[in-house]
Structure formats: C-alpha cells, structure tokens
Amino acid sequence: MPYSDKIIAETSKAPKSLGNLLGRWAVKLDFPVIKISDYTGATRQSIYNWFGGSEVSPAYRRSVENLLAILQSSSTAEEAMRKCNKSK
C-alpha cells in the first residue's frame, strides 16, 4: 500500500536523521511500515514518528541501522523483503 501524500511530504521536509533516512528509503521503495515494525519490533506509530524526525531510541538503533542498509542495497521492496527474511 503506497504512502499517503501527507506522510511523503512530512518525511521529505523533516531533518535527516537515522529514522528519517529509514522513512525516505521506505517511501522510495514503497516498503510497508508493517514490515518495518516486524523487522525492528517497534510500533507503527514509533516508526511514523521516526519518519518525521524523532530520534530512534537505543533499543531499536541496531535493527534500524541494519534495515536501512538493506533498503539502501535494494532496488525494490520485494528484494528488500527477501533480504530481511534472510537476515533474521
């Protein structure tokens, strides 16, 4: 399911941070928030907050960094999902 125009606009305007970079790549690849939640263990609300520039708490930092690397090395959401499944 594509991201809403509101989420896309908020993500593109927010200061670049770890969570915001995750959001920018998720939007670019249309990688679902529920999959980010599954991978990181964070709530969907937390993830949307990260997209908007909120700080990623230390408990989630490593999984967010790992997922960001997966998204950055993928050309499609499907490819990223396959890589996520292999890395778990």
Where are these regions (language model features)?
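DNA major-groove recognition helix of helix-turn-helix/homeodomain DNA-binding modules
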Residues: P58-E78
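Residues in the recognition helix of alpha-helical DNA-binding motifs
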Residues: W25, Y39, W50
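A short, Lys/Arg-rich alpha-helix, primarily the initiator
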Residues: P2-L29
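Helix-turn-helix/homeodomain-like alpha-helical modules used for DNA recognition
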Residues: E79-K88
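Recognition helix of helix-turn-helix/homeodomain-like DNA-binding domains
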Residues: A42-V56
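Short alpha-helical "recognition helix" segments of helix-turn-helix
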Residues: K35-S37
